[in-house]
Amino acid sequence: MYAKLSEFEEKVISGITEDRWLKLATELIKTGQPRACDPLDPDLPSGEEEAIAMLVAGKLEALGMEVNKYESQPHRPNIVGILKGSGSGPVLMMNDHMDTYPVVEPHKWDKTNFKPFKATRAGDLLYARGSSDTRGNLACTILA
């Protein structure tokens, strides 16, 4: 049994359809795959999310948001999109991250024909590096 959604919750998720999500998630997954970043392993290169950040910024601007970029490290900008409301009600903040882990054991990515950043659908599942951490989630956030 599922909890009943409020009218506000229904409105927030009404923009998320399977087709829109699949298209956007696929685009986000293949865009600007970052290098690894692991503070416990200084031999790995630093992370880089600039390409995905600029894509997200463009998507938010297209939705009519004011977009700000904050960069505390080179090639790792944070994107903030602001959509001003018309009333004095509460603020809704949605947040996600854009980095993904590097591909480990590429020989095990048989569901994607050994192309981990190629989103591949099998039934109700979407396989790709970043599909659940967290480009798929990010697609939902943008569509909401």
Which ranges hold each PLM region?
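N-terminal helical capping/dimerization or prosegment-like subdomains
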Residues: 2-105
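Active-site metal-coordination/substrate-binding segment of hydrolases
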Residues: 89-144
